């Protein structure tokens, strides 16, 4: 009996460590879920986890939005592995994936845009009376920010990259 225990223990100690991948998946899913909740969605975590693990949305709009977020995350992971640069094309591709099932064509007084294709909004957001941003300046400002951030990301280490990405989110 002791010999069986020692054999089992040795097999346990020499097995590959899979806990790190499980923990990374948990942290990733928790990050995505909290990001989804920041968007004002109230989806139970078990349903969100089911969408991520199966890769299939349910028939409600909220679950399709969660699925789109998951698909956008997978796209970002693939592009990061390929070391694709951060530019407007990448931002539009991610935007199109996030809005794939719930976006659509919108017509404003200044033109048409389709959020499901990753188009930028043609219209202004207002805070009470004053506009928050001039929509015509957004593509140029975003392009400049992408180029600056891309240069910083290639020159920085892993811990600095987190700060750079956080600054990117804050600046834009």
Briefly describe each language-model feature range:
Residues 1-172:
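FIC/Doc superfamily catalytic core
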């Amino acid at each position: 009996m002791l010999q069986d225990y020692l054999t089992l223990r040795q097999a346990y100690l020499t097995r590959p460590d899979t806990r790190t991948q499980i923990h990374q998946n948990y942290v990733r899913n928790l990050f995505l879920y909290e990001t989804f909740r920041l968007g004002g969605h109230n989806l139970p975590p078990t349903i969100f986890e089911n969408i991520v693990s199966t890769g299939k949305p349910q028939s409600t709009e909220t679950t399709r939005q969660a699925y789109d977020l998951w698909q956008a995350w997978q796209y970002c992971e693939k592009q990061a592995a390929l070391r694709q640069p951060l530019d407007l094309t990448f931002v539009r591709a991610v935007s199109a994936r996030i809005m794939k099932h719930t976006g659509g064509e919108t017509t404003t007084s200044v033109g048409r845009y389709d959020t499901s294709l990753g188009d930028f909004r043609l219209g202004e957001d207002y805070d009470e009376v004053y506009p928050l941003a001039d929509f015509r300046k957004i593509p140029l400002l975003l392009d400049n920010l992408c180029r600056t951030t891309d240069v910083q990301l290639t020159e920085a280490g892993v811990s600095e990259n987190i700060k750079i990405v956080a600054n990117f989110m804050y600046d834009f």
